From Swiss-Prot:
One of its GO terms (molecular function) is P-type potassium transmembrane transporter activity. The keyword Transmembrane applies. This is Potassium-transporting ATPase potassium-binding subunit. It comes from the Bacteria. The system is composed of three essential subunits: KdpA, KdpB and KdpC. Part of the high-affinity ATP-driven potassium transport (or Kdp) system, which catalyzes the hydrolysis of ATP coupled with the electrogenic transport of potassium into the cytoplasm. This subunit binds the periplasmic potassium ions and delivers the ions to the membrane domain of KdpB through an intramembrane tunnel. Belongs to the KdpA family. It comes from Rhodospirillum rubrum (strain ATCC 11170 / ATH 1.1.1 / DSM 467 / LMG 4362 / NCIMB 8255 / S1). The chain crosses the membrane at residues 5-25, 65-85, 87-107, 136-156, 178-198, 254-274, 284-304, 383-403, 421-441, 461-481, 488-508, 531-551. Its main location: membrane.
Length: 569
């Protein structure tokens, strides 16, 4: 790893650190109902939307009503997107004349975008029309991200309020997230991407004459607008099959830096929002520090592995002074590819600017571990922080047991009900990953979709189900996902991995909101210092990581050992 790579890492981390309090403070004002600068522009539109839809913005909801509103809204989005994909051939803005999407793929895709996963078992430019991309996918990119943030805000209110029966209004939180946060930032980002060279057009595909003769069809479309919210909302689904490795999605070094920053900006800012809304910014910075520590360690391992040559190439006498460049854009290099890979899986985004399948075994394991930990290292917008707060409750529970006190966090007692719900949310991901993956691979058609033998083939299949369950969406590209068993099983894993985690979180929020705040005493465990940060990271690694150690030992760890010994498969 050279000085240039170190400089890129430092610059990226410095930008995220600088944006965290700025975005965090702004979002705290938005979700507290305060007027902000954009209220002049969006205030009348917000009030008009409430009147049109019959929403009473001052009327708050019990956690169960909040959850029901969230489920109904997402079910409507799922059915609407599925219908768009199935009748695509009859809809406008389809210059390539693409037909209807197959039922199983349409189900998988609809679930993917509604759950903020953006798993893509298809090639965007060869499967979906402009209408499907804009009205179907891009709309869900906004509202699925807003759903995650709304759930987080409800949980924060549960910690901040005392003896309260309500958590806010889902429809208000959803609307304010889209209008005051996602839409303005996405609009500005889209303009910057157009300036940098990303297409934004409804015109036909272009016929080109390459130098080697013949003809070539160059796909275009409204790329910049989808790219902006794809990065900002931790969505990740690319307009093109190769995602942000495509020069139309990611044209320049500046666009690459902007898109990398967007991967973590909102998720990092929400830690500061949390601290402000509970009345103690130190709590937010403690969570930010824990996330940053795990992020930097993972990034260090990835850069170390990718900066060195592949041992198999060294044995063969092939010069690889630039590191492991397989599957990477030469214009971006190892450092940018490594930062993006770690950030996109830390952030539940899933977009890529390099092929994770071509990473060295241990480097490819880092993104997978980021997802296996529940994507709490910043995580998806909203989803990452409420996942982290589940681990926080487990941590203070363990700390309370060690000193013989009832666990507390922010003055709220963490009792049996909260712990049972927390354990449910922690058990859902491994059950989906290992269970659905094992069941799917009993089908010969599904097993045949794994294109590589040996431990790497196991890693490809495992990565797919980890990515789907964790609502990430990235993939090891040697895995042929568009077959019925995987479309069905990954679709179910995405649904369960999203909503069977959200529901316990909202139940916890309701339970905490109804409690009184216990005064701080001499025996209260401080949750803003280095001891707590270290204990929290330890709990995440032990509880989240050791669950998967056996299958990791059979996959990337075994592959690394074989590679170092000179054994190929």
């Amino acid at each position: 790893m050279d000085a240039n790579a170190i400089l890129q890492v430092v610059l990226f981390c410095a930008i995220i650190l600088g944006l965290t309090p700025l975005l965090g403070g702004y979002m705290a004002r938005v979700f507290s109902g305060e007027r902000v600068l954009l209220s002049v522009v969006f205030g009348p539109l917000e009030r008009g939307l409430y009147r049109l839809s019959g929403v009473r913005p001052k009327e708050e909801q019990h956690w169960a009503a909040y959850a029901l509103s969230m489920l109904v809204f997402n079910l409507a989005g799922l059915l609407g997107l599925y219908l768009i994909l199935r009748v695509q051939g009859w809809l406008p803005l389809n210059p390539a004349g693409l037909g209807a999407v197959a039922p199983d793929l349409a189900f998988n895709t609809a679930v993917s975008f509604v759950t903020n996963t953006n798993w893509q078992a298809y090639g965007g430019e060869s499967t979906l029309s402009y209408f499907s991309q804009m009205v179907g996918l891009t709309v869900q990119n906004f509202v699925s991200a807003a759903t995650g943030i709304a759930v987080l805000v409800a949980l924060i209110r549960g910690f901040a309020r005392r003896s309260a029966r309500t958590l806010g209004n889902f429809w208000v939180d959803l609307t304010r997230t889209v209008l005051y946060l996602l839409l303005p930032l996405a609009f500005v980002t889209a303009l910057v991407l157009v300036w940098q060279g990303a297409p934004q057009t409804l015109g036909d595909y272009v016929q080109a004459a390459p130098l080697e003769g013949g003809s070539q069809v160059i796909a275009l479309g409204p790329v910049a607008s989808q790219e902006a919210i794809k990065q900002l909302g931790s969505n990740g689904g690319g307009f093109f099959s190769v995602n942000s490795a495509h020069p139309f999605e990611n044209p320049t070094p500046l666009s690459n830096l902007i898109e990398m920053v967007l991967l973590l900006a909102v998720a990092a800012g929400l830690t500061n929002t949390f601290g402000r809304m509970v009345g103690d910014t130190r709590q937010g910075w403690a969570l930010f520090a824990a996330m940053s520590l795990m992020f930097v360690v993972g990034l260090g391992v990835t850069l170390w592995q990718e900066s060195a040559a592949n041992p198999a190439m060294v044995v063969a006498g092939i010069e690889a002074g630039g590191g492991n460049m397989e599957g990477k854009e030469v214009r971006l290099g190892v450092a940018n590819s490594a930062i993006w890979a770690v950030a996109t899986t830390a952030a539940s985004n899933g977009s890529v600017n390099a092929m994770h399948d071509s990473f060295m075994p241990l480097a490819g394991m880092v993104p997978m571990i980021n997802m296996m930990l529940g994507e709490v290292i910043f995580g998806g917008v909203g989803a990452g922080l409420y996942g982290m707060l589940i681990f926080v409750m487990v941590t203070v529970f363990i700390a309370g047991l060690m000193v013989g006190r009832t666990p507390e966090y922010l003055g709220k007692k963490i009792e049996a009900r909260e712990m049972k719900l927390a354990v449910i949310s922690l058990l859902v991901p491994p059950l989906c990953i290992l269970g659905f993956g094992a069941v799917a691979l009993t089908w010969p058609q599904a097993a045949a979709s794994v294109q590589d033998p040996g431990p790497h083939g196991l890693t490809e299949a495992l990565y797919a189900y980890v990515s789907g369950t964790a609502n990430n969406g990235s993939a090891f590209a040697g895995f042929a996902a568009n077959v019925f068993p995987h479309n069905l099983m990954i679709g179910l894993a995405m649904l369960i991995g999203r909503f069977l985690v959200i529901l316990p979180v909202l139940a916890i929020a309701g339970s905490l909101g109804a409690k009184k705040i216990v005064p701080v005493s001499a025996g209260t465990f401080p949750t803003h210092g280095g001891l707590f940060i270290g204990l929290l990271v330890g709990v995440i690694v032990v509880v989240g990581g050791l669950t998967y150690f056996p299958v990791l030992a059979l996959g990337p760890i075994l592959e690394q050992l074989m590679l170092r010994s000179g054994s190929l498969f």
